[in-house]
Amino acid sequence: MSESAPAGSKEGVSFGNLPRPEPRTSKDQQKLSISTDVKKPSHSAPVTPVRSARSSMEQPTFRPVAKNSVTVAPARAAGFCPPQFEEYHHGRSHSLVSPPPSPHFLKRISFDTFNNKAATDFSLTLKTQHQAYKWTRTSRTFLCGMDGNSYSEVAVDWLFETLLADNDEAVVLRVIDPSSKLAEDLSDEQSYRSLAEHIMAGILKKVDDDKAVSIIVELVVGKPQDMILRTIHVYSPDSLIVGTRGKALNSFQSLLSSGSVSKFCLQKSPIPVIVVRPDRKRVRSKNKRLKDKTRKSYMEILEKSGR
């Protein structure tokens, strides 16, 4: 026995209380296809194809920029503006050239009294200083007398090698006796100046480049004894250094000989005096004392001092 399909069903499908749909016709399908078409609104902008947009990115338009600037064309075309940098041009005006090295000793002062016709004595002063020289409360001033003899050169050498230290000042006094032959040869001011510059150049060769000292050359025409006392009064040095011939005489007889400048300095100088003998004669005297058996105490002192 077979069951019959309920009312309101089609081919075994039940629609319940819903109204039964009507079958679609060819006219209804035509209306549905027309309604599904997308119509472009009148207010929308035209759509650019993707390929044409890429071609416009590859061919950007350029804007004139400054000559000395750095730009990136692809970044500008993409809407990014990089910061502007001025280009550095290396030329003579921008090149860093080190200045020539300055000399270790610089000229500071130079004057003379040759133009003063009323003066009885004439003098010429040359002064030079190391570029690192600086006067301090512990700075010392030394006066060294010299002449044309070799023993005076020994005194100058000993001063700069042994006694002179940084920030000290050395005054080298060169006295020319008016009655000497040298005074006759030096007839004009230029000849005196040339002699003073020659003395200064010889002294600078004796000084180490790293020794910060001040050097003064006093070239004076007059009596040596009077000029020494006058120079001591002007500069107030701490001590006076002079040379000696070192004759083979006992004790201070050679220093106190008649007419000796060292004798005058020892007797009349208001400041301490250092008398320097030539090196070879000092070594000879030292060896002689070492061989003397009666001076054992002196030899012991030398051994303890390491000399």
UniProtKB/Swiss-Prot annotation:
Disordered as annotated region, ranges: 1-63
Modified residue annotations for Phosphoserine: 44, 98, 102
Intracellular or extracellular location(s): Barrier septum; Cell tip
Gene Ontology terms, MF aspect: catalytic activity
One Pfam family named in its UniProt record: Usp
Gene3D superfamilies: HUPs
Assigned GO CC terms: cell cortex; cell division site; cell tip; division septum
Keywords: Phosphoprotein, Stress response
InterPro entries in the cross-refs: Rossmann-like_a/b/a_fold, UspA
Sites of Phosphothreonine modification: 48
Biased composition (Basic and acidic residues): 21-30
UniProt key word Phosphoprotein: yes
Family (UniProt): Belongs to the universal stress protein A family.
UniProt protein name: Universal stress protein A family protein C25B2.10
Natural source organism: Schizosaccharomyces pombe (strain 972 / ATCC 24843) (Fission yeast)
